[in-house]
Amino acid sequence: MTASSSDACDPHAEARMASNAHLPAARMAEVVREYGPYPGAPAVHGVSHDGDRVWAATAAGLLAIDPASGEVQRTLPCAADAGTAFDGRHLYQIGDSQIQKIDPQSGRVVGTIPAPSGQGSDSGLTWAEGSLWVGQYRDRRIVQIDPETGAVRRTIESNRFVTGVTWVDGELWHGTWEGDESELRRVDPADGAVIERLALPANVGVSGLESDGAGLFYCGGGNSGKVRAVRRPKQA
């Protein structure tokens, strides 16, 4: 993911400010808890939630974290350099330009498909509506793919790097991280228009995003090695 830098040293900062001018005003995100860093896991590349545990993609593989205690309950060794997803039965993990389908009980890889970019720019990953949704940070887009074949079903464009993606209650959210600025954005799945923005504190990156299906988002924290729980806004 993108390394932190100040806007004074960022040649794209002015362009980002211009592209954000027509967007809804950002509100500050409410970070309610931080987890980690954990031994042997200096960076978090993706996150998911299986209804009970938070899964974090790290150099050590997938860590299953108890969200109440913050303790690591299990580690599944696998290539894990980007997004993570859960379909109710299997985990999906981006690693080495592939998406691995993993049995969380045994840790066995039961299938693989090519990651859509094939160039290491796939980042966020989530499961919804019978599809995998892949954030592509360099290409600034989200692609919906067939989980069996990897075929692209549709593409949603963004004006920012996409570093995490999740669906919750019919809402599509994605994480962004450019320079020292990170946000969580709710977007219209029909055309990608930004509906809502939550700004993370300066120098807090987002590398992976998932909802717990209730009141929280979980965000990977890149090279901080942390996972952060962020309050999900209540909708009217």
PLM regions and their residue ranges:
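A short helix->beta-strand "capping" segment at the edge of beta-propeller domains
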Residues: M17-A41
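Conserved beta-strand positions in repeat-built beta-propeller and related beta-rich domains
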Residues: W55-A60, L91-S97, V134-D139, H174-G179, ...
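A short beta-strand motif characteristic of beta-propeller blades
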Residues: E30-Y38, E71-L76, R108-A115, A151-I156, ...
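Blade-level signature of beta-propeller repeat domains, shared across WD40, Kelch, NHL, RCC1
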Residues: V206-A236
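WD40 beta-propeller blade core
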Residues: L63-A64, Q100, V143, R185, ...
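Short loop/turn segments that connect beta-strands within beta-propeller blades
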Residues: D66-G70, D103-G107, D146-G150, D188-G192, ...
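Beta-rich, blade/repeat-based domains predominating
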Residues: Y38-G51, C78-G88, P116-E129, N159-G170, ...
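Loop/turn-rich, solvent-exposed surfaces of beta-rich toroidal or solenoidal domains
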Residues: V162-V168, H174-E183
